[in-house]
Amino acid sequence: LREMHRQQQLRLIEQRISEIPADAPLIVAGDFNDWRQKADLSRSGLREVFVETHGKPARTFPARLPLLPLDRIYVRNLKVHNARVLTTRPWSHLADHVPLSVEIEL
């Protein structure tokens, strides 16, 4: 995707988030293809789990040697614990990105 398209998609996500009550628990997660680290949803009250727990986004691509932080887990009104990048087998061989994992407490 071009940067312009990514920004349009982020605006659409933010628009949907604005329709959800601000005090409702919310998780937004997935492949943002955000290698420039511009997918900031903090305006919507969301916190990025790995930035919060590890000080930086998780590296998830390519799966065999993760260098780029393309995937994100954002939360709102939730506590997070044990955020991990699953780099071992079988996880590292299931897709071109390694999966992210986090325990969430209501």
PLM feature spans:
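Active-site regions of metal-assisted phosphoester/phosphodiester hydrolases
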Residues: 1-106
